[in-house]
């Protein structure tokens, strides 16, 4: 459909030009247009996205003239113009189109060419644009073939970061060619909202259903989901949540696993970076526990006196015993075996922090083991919402470390694991230290080749370790704070996108991917899965022998 012509009143370049919109046509921001022009003897097509739209009066000189025009006193024309930024030129002849060339709205194959969809070997639905056209992302830039990782930023409660992360993961699990060899791990950090992802959302509206249909996705909940929740204080075999069925299991680690896998390192939160001696003691104790585990019978953890260590409380007693032995005997070998050459005050500083952490992690360490097993289901949801920040650090670090180690041992990208982690600025902060920062960095820098893909979300990308953000091929932005969006982390926001980022509504995101030189505005539908118990659609079960009546 023709919408206007290339204007000759403004300079025309191969990278941008202005168009005059024809009467009766509507052109808005983000519309995808194209021009076919004769350059020499060659037909060249210029594809682009509208990034500015203006209307003004031609022939009017004074501000008050607008009032006179509205009354019909002064005859003037209303100019309707738009600026188009190029996304693609076919063939690549970098000469400008000519004034007066017709401008058309890109649809069908022309729309796909404008956004390079025709060159994407595998594409995944990522939402729709303002005109209802499906917006795709190049899956090879997510799954590790050409790039990996997704970074989602935006204000808390308004930017719908988690909602978009879930939608993107759902699209991957439904449409990716390798979906049968893909697993997802979601860390639920706020409330119990994600414990119903396998249930239909009774509040899903018809408009959202149409958007799902347009993208070729089923408006259905996630399938083959396992939920892992911290154990109850009263019964370690009962999850601490209101949902109790066979799809929900408590998770915890054995004290033997705790020792073998060095999980004690994840009990020490941010704020220890200024106490270098603490890290020395942490490493000494971790190495001591590993040595004890190697010399203990299977399934047990014995100390140097062949006494069982069955809980963190037992371990706490052994550490205190070693410190007290040092106070009575300056050349204590027991103390040295646990704390090395550390001063007693450093050992006490470690012990105080360890004792505090035990209060928040204690119920997760038991004699037996029941850790999350991501490989058994397509999607695993690990609920850490009820844990203290120390407990959250411990669980996230322990799981990610094990996943990464298992993938290293496999040495192949399949099966691939997509990890959805919110509040990334807490786990991989730009400044300071966190116990799992190195693990997240390993995933960001080496996860691509191992098939461990991070879908990270944070309020402010400026507070996340820059190597994590830089290694994310796909960048998504929800509504942002006006000061944050000026940071260099958002340099991909060209034109007026920084200004638009502070005005985005819920369900609308800015999407940037390597294939397309310009960012794009996308809308995504409301979740087809319940995000809280009140949204769960009741299931009606009909007995098999009902038809016999």
Where do the language-model regions lie?
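Basic- and hydrophobic-enriched, low-structure N-terminal and domain-boundary segments
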Residues: 1-155, 168-171, 175-181, 413-415, ...
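Conserved P-loop NTPase catalytic core
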Residues: 209-244, 470-491, 502-505
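P-loop NTPase motor domains
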Residues: 182, 186-187, 191-197, 220-221, ...
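Conserved beta-strand position immediately N-terminal to the Walker
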Residues: 150-151, 382, 455
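Glycine-rich phosphate-binding loop of nucleotide-binding enzymes
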Residues: 126-226, 437, 466, 511, ...
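Substrate-engagement module of ASCE P-loop NTPases
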Residues: 171-175, 212-218, 402-408, 439-455
């Amino acid at each position: 459909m023709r919408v206007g012509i290339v204007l000759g009143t403004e300079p025309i370049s191969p990278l941008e030009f202005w168009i005059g919109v024809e009467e009766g046509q509507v052109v808005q921001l983000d519309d995808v247009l194209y021009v076919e022009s004769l350059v020499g003897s060659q037909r060249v097509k210029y594809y682009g996205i509208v990034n500015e739209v203006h209307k003004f009066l031609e022939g009017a000189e004074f501000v008050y003239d607008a009032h006179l025009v509205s009354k019909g006193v002064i005859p003037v024309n209303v100019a309707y113009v738009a600026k188009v930024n190029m996304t693609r030129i076919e063939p690549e002849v970098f000469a400008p189109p000519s004034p007066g060339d017709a401008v058309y709205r890109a649809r069908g194959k022309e729309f796909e060419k404008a956004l390079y969809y025709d060159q994407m070997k595998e594409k995944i639905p990522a939402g729709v644009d303002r005109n209802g056209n499906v917006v795709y992302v190049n899956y090879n830039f997510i799954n590790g073939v050409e790039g990996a990782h997704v970074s989602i930023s935006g204000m808390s409660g308004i930017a719908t970061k988690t909602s978009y992360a879930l939608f993107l993961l759902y699209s991957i699990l439904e449409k990716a060619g390798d979906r049968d060899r893909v697993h997802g791990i979601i860390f639920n950090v706020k409330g119990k909202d994600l414990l119903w992802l396998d249930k239909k959302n009774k509040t899903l509206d018809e408009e959202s259903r149409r958007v799902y249909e347009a993208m070729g996705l089923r408006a259905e909940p996630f399938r083959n989901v396992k939920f892992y929740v911290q154990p109850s204080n009263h019964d370690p075999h009962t999850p601490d949540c209101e949902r109790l069925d066979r799809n929900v299991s408590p998770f915890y680690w054995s004290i033997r696993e705790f020792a073998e896998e060095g999980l004690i390192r994840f009990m020490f939160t941010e704020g220890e970076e200024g106490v270098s001696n603490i890290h020395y003691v942490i490493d000494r104790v971790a190495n001591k526990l590993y040595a004890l585990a190697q010399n203990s019978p299977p399934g047990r953890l014995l100390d140097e006196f062949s006494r069982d260590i069955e809980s963190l409380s037992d371990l706490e007693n052994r550490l205190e015993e070693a410190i007290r032995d040092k106070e009575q005997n300056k050349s204590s070998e027991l103390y040295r075996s646990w704390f090395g050459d550390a001063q007693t005050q450093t050992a006490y500083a470690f012990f105080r922090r360890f004792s505090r952490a035990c209060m928040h992690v204690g119920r997760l360490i038991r004699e037996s083991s029941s850790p999350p097993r991501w490989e058994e289901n397509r999607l695993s949801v690990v609920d850490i919402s009820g844990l203290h920040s120390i407990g959250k650090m411990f669980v996230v670090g322990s799981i990610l470390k094990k996943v990464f180690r298992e993938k290293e041992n496999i040495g192949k990208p399949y099966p691939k694991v997509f990890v959805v982690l919110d509040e990334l600025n807490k786990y991989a902060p730009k400044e300071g230290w966190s116990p799992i920062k190195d693990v997240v960095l390993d995933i960001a820098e080496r996860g691509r080749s191992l098939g461990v893909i991070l879908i990270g979300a944070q309020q402010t990308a400026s507070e996340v370790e820059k190597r994590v953000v830089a290694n994310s091929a796909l960048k998504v932005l929800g509504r942002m704070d006006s000061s944050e969006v000026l940071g260099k982390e958002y340099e991909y926001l060209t034109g007026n996108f920084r200004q638009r980022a502070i005005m985005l509504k819920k369900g609308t995101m800015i999407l940037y991917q390597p294939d397309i030189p310009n960012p794009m505005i996308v809308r995504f539908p409301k979740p087809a899965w319940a995000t809280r118990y009140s949204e769960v659609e009741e299931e009606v079960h009909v007995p098999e022998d009902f038809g016999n009546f």
